[in-house]
């Protein structure tokens, strides 16, 4: 029998069936060979991790932690995924992880303190789904490698979508619900036709556009 998932190392990427759009985008931004540490329905203590510098991917699901204090020990982390952590309030420590390329946040309704986006200069993908306390997305326009932004069933409090307009690297914005007030979506599509903006139905459009671009190189 397999041992319990008590902070075990794994090489197989955990895929959330609830996060379909990230599944589709996986083929572009994810590396399933990353050395992964996963916690599920258990206590999380970063101080007890052996050889934390070797961990490249962290996945935490259904855990009752309230903050990510101590996570800075994972200095080579490239990907972090947080799912259904209903008591998590402070994720500001993510900003200490300078190697991060991919952040997936899913069903974190109690978050009040967020990380500073501009600090994560290696970020390629940033995804919010049902996450609380999003004051702003300002800073994404400063990220030179960011190609994917996910805004699903969230509200951005300052209602400022200009960072999307200003970004020079964004290719795809997953948009579900109304993260900004009307007519944000209409305006964005008008002013940035080069960015594919929309829900799951737009995945096919994005990949067709991507393939055409590659064929022309």
Segments from the language model and where they lie:
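Concave beta-strand-loop units of leucine-rich repeat
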Residues: 1-66, 73-89, 96-183, 189-217
